[in-house]
């Protein structure tokens, strides 16, 4: 089933997203008009998280959802008060950005808490607190991965920066621009060689995994924001803050810090 919207434009079109599970847009010369098409995921109506009867952001109290939020994509709860998804091209771009940021946030949240947990259980780190760890590279001995100089021994911030730019830039460029392993695959959910475990083989299971990914990713983005605020306000890592709160919840909570916090002190 396809929903067509004709918008005024005069450029030769393009096709974005070839996977049957993704947002399909075809733009072509049609007089002075442009045809934009969306293709609904075939397996979506069989899942409670997709379609018209999917859960809404306020449950039974949700207002009329916008007509352009049809429930064909994971994480669509019918909420768009700012109209960010009204334009199909903007919607497609924002979906891609959200999924990518969700994945980075999930990795980041794990990286913020895991070293502290290991440190509290006897694993030696030069610095286990996430926002202090990078400063170890400026110390006399440099930065050792997991405290072991035989793994990764970094002493140059410029070398680290160059490696990140080159390696991460290459991967991101490959994802966006395509290549032998990614040709003809979707930019958000490539599958193929990028799915060695075959998680996308079953369309129904894959549709559910997309929902789980976006929900956990959104939670991780909020978590990272909380870690940033904690670091600024308390100067401690998330695990130490949690431990302090458990030991004395009255003195260590958001309200107590908010009423006593003075920026710059």
UniProtKB/Swiss-Prot annotation:
Q: Per UniProt, what is one Pfam family of this protein?
A: Chloroa_b-bind
Q: Does the keyword Phosphoprotein apply?
A: yes
Residues annotated to bind chlorophyll b 4: 164, 175
* Cofactor mode of binding and number, as noted: Binds at least 14 chlorophylls (8 Chl-a and 6 Chl-b) and carotenoids such as lutein and neoxanthin.
One Gene Ontology cellular component annotation held by this UniProt entry: photosystem II
Q: Which GO terms describe its biological process?
A: photosynthesis, light harvesting in photosystem I; response to light stimulus
Q: What residue range does the UniProt record give for the transit peptide?
A: 1-37
Cellular localisation: Plastid, Chloroplast thylakoid membrane
Cited function: The light-harvesting complex (LHC) functions as a light receptor, it captures and delivers excitation energy to photosystems with which it is closely associated.
Q: What is known of its domains?
A: The N-terminus of the protein extends into the stroma where it is involved with adhesion of granal membranes and post-translational modifications; both are believed to mediate the distribution of excitation energy between photosystems I and II.
Q: Which family does it belong to?
A: Belongs to the light-harvesting chlorophyll a/b-binding (LHC) protein family.
This protein's name: Chlorophyll a-b binding protein 4, chloroplastic
> What species was this sequence derived from?
Solanum lycopersicum
